[in-house]
Amino acid sequence: MSNLTPIATYNLALQPFQPVPAIEDDFPISIRITLASLDPEAADDKAEPSSLRILKKSNSLLSDDYFEDDDDDEEEDDEEDELDDEEEEEEAEEEKSSKKSNGKKSSKKDEDEEEDDEEEDDEDNDEDDVSEYIVCTLSPKHQYQQTLDLTITPDEEVYFVVTGSYPIHLTGNYIEHPADQDEEDYDNEDEDYDDEYDLSPDEDEIIYGAPLDDEYDDEEESEEEGTPKIEEIVEEKEKVKESPKESKKRVAEESTSKKSKKAKKDEKKSVQFSKELEQGPTGSTLVEKDNKKATPTKDKKETPVKDDGDKKKKFPTKTLLGGVITEDRKIGSGATAKSGAKVGIRYIGKLKNGKVFDKNTSGKPFSFKLGKGECIKGFDLGVTGMAVGGERRVIIPPKMGYGSQALPGIPANSELTFDIKLVSLK
């Protein structure tokens, strides 16, 4: 996803003289405001035009992390400041001693003047902490709306306030912004995900139709079957006198025994759920393995080559806003799903312990519009960017799912995992 890509709609209603934060603490996502509209119903009888104002701290963008790399420079500056402070204190003591010699009255006046200066400095500092800016002024007699282009990140402490008689409504989008997360955070979250999240065999059977252990066993057995082929070449050279009829019989017996072994393995791998799930998520690794079995060997003398990459196939993963993790199992074709598009999907929803709490694998696909708030935030983010025919695993943390709300089959603060297949896009 590119920078500043819209991911959901943003709306905020402002009543006169009631400051409201631009970004809520429980949903720290960057926003882009594009329109300010006036509510024609006045909140009082004065009918005064309403002005939209921004209240922000001038130093809000400078977080503690900004200074971590400059610790050494700060220590040097602190030492210089301490020396300057000591010199100033010495000068002040000398001045006080000279003033005492001139009389007690003059010293009292100086102390009063210093206290007044300190109070004025404190007032100036308080005023400098918060800055106020007028964005636009709207009136039902002259102008109802004003187009804007304001981008605000969670690091900024920004409040909106309306002065006047009419409420103002703001419209825009939640966007993906580089300031929301660093690349180092993505890498750390990916490492934690690889270490902590482990699929149980039952879940793999639901998705792929066979446990992962069976796949590795099949590859090991195929390697073991490949070893006798090399030994057969040596034996054929040594046993030249063997009749062609006997050799044909032996080859036929070996082929029938191999077919019976494969039939038994296929029976073990068959899962009832995979038969019912005709349009649901499929396992690409299982399809590739079946294609390898169906391809006959043209020459027995060819030495089988081991491919370590096929044993442990890694799927591309991404960490999105709010900690949502996506893993593309199969890339679709055609246009990709964006905010405002209507999508139709098949899905299987599971808890972290592997328990299935919801699914749509047959009948009418589940349809909704992206970015319109028709589903949980993590689901909106997870489906965005998919193409028709694509399959994706989406892992949603509690804050991007149902949070502390408990639902039937879903405990509070649950991490949700969805295996999704996009079947339609409009």
UniProtKB/Swiss-Prot annotation:
It is found in: Nucleus, Nucleolus. Inhibited by both FK506 and rapamycin. Residues 65-94, 111-131, 181-225 have a biased composition (Acidic residues). The keyword Transport does not apply. Residues 340-426 form the PPIase FKBP-type domain. Keywords: Isomerase, Nucleus, Rotamase. One of its GO terms (cellular component) is chromatin. It holds the Pfam family NPL. It is an enzyme of class 5 (isomerase). Its main location: nucleus. PROSITE patterns: FKBP_PPIASE. It catalyses: [protein]-peptidylproline (omega=180) = [protein]-peptidylproline (omega=0). Residues 37-143, 171-314 are annotated as: Disordered. InterPro entries: NPL, PPIase_dom_sf, PPIase_FKBP_dom, PPIase_Fpr3/Fpr4-like. Residues 226-257, 264-278, 287-311 have a biased composition (Basic and acidic residues). One of its GO terms (molecular function) is peptidyl-prolyl cis-trans isomerase activity. Its EC number is 5.2.1.8. PPIases accelerate the folding of proteins. It catalyzes the cis-trans isomerization of proline imidic peptide bonds in oligopeptides. Belongs to the FKBP-type PPIase family. FKBP3/4 subfamily. This is FK506-binding protein 3.
